[in-house]
Amino acid sequence: MNKKLIRVLIVEDSPVATIILKRILDAPPEIEVVGAAKSGIEGLEMIPRVQPDVICTDLHMPRMGGLEFTSEVMARFPKPILVISSSVQPEDTHNVFKLLDAGAVDVFPKPRAGITGNGYEILKQELLAKIRILAGVSVFTMRRKTKTLPPISPVAGTGDEVGGTGMRSLRPPASEQRSPSPNPSPGRTSPGSGNEVVSPLRRANVPPQEYGAKPGSMSLGRASGARGAGATGLPLGNQDPTKAKKTPLPSAPRLPTTSFKILTIGASTGGPQALQGILSQLPANFPVPIVCIQHISEGFLQGLVDWLNSECSLEVKIAPLAEKPQPGYVYFPPEGKHLEFDTGGRFVYSSAPPCAGHRPSVTVTFNAIAARYGAEAMAVLLTGMGRDGADGMLSISEAGGLTIAQDEASCVVFGMPKEAIALGAAKYILPINDIPPLVINKLLSKM
């Protein structure tokens, strides 16, 4: 039986870029370029006729640009979309992530005229790998909106107190809790058992949902009773997504010390949207630093950082060399470097060979965090192809840290979390929307 071809539609107004893309994509026998459109309008007209499996779109095009085109595709006939961008101007890299916010899956640098030799071969292999991945991803017809989580407020006599803090647990009400699985997985506790809640691993047909809108996030202090503010008087996240600039909070009160000292998150394909969905739910007074590792094409990291900064209450930045991680910040490794720690707990960069094909590597940083923080670490492994992060998550788990893997139904690509689960490295297996409440709950219970 012949293997089904991967049908690709190119939507690109640059003749040079289109020629290079067609040359690359027509090379392997399992991929077929079924059309090339010069604008978003032309692309929309072609989709019902050519029935692509994957769409490659430019950012800037006449008549209808990439953002409007992506929004229309996701509303009318959702397909996996790869954004092709030159990523030269800072405003362009930021706009690229607006396309991901609208439903595109991944980004890739636009081929340049005159690229030859080793540079062309690397570009070719990376593009073909992305197309093969995107041909099998889960596409959500709408962006999944995360429910705005309520501020944590003092309660009395409800039985919901955790850790003796007098703050309400983020456990859902009984009417919303999952029923126990009739056949729980061996060695794992089923939901509703009163012990650790682990969502069963399964393939589910989920209805169209939204993925990571911009709700207000939680505050970790006691509720003040003022709407729109948390207990510490801090705003509940970035409630207005158009206001990217953060107000400095030099004297913002922080929570009591928690026994967890760091949160680390790894992601690949589909990761920018998943990171936005989690980080936008965490408040500015989040009590531990966050270290994220995201596989992303060269040239797009700063755009990702800038976009997340506009979406989150926390400050997002590239990890500065020789600086100690601090609460209130989200750190990313620089492009092309592993991120680790020196003996004093300060950030160090490494040019060691790629691990699981990646530098920066999730596993390298997870291993460094396991060695440095041990049981004081929380780790989350999100959507992505391959197995990077699985061994590192096992290191954190074996060191006594808390580990969470995104579940299959909410992953764009169920690869990295699946590998971690197969190793027994994930203590929790959860939908993306359930991860922020669990993180907050565990932080509170450790105070």
Predicted regions located by residue number:
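Walker A/P-loop phosphate-binding element recognition
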Residues: 165
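Small, basic N-terminal interaction modules of short regulatory proteins
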Residues: 191
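Conserved acid/base catalytic micro-environments in cytosolic active-site loops
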Residues: 2-9, 15-30, 41-42, 48-49, ...
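Acidic, two-metal ion nucleic-acid-processing modules in DNA metabolism proteins
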Residues: 38
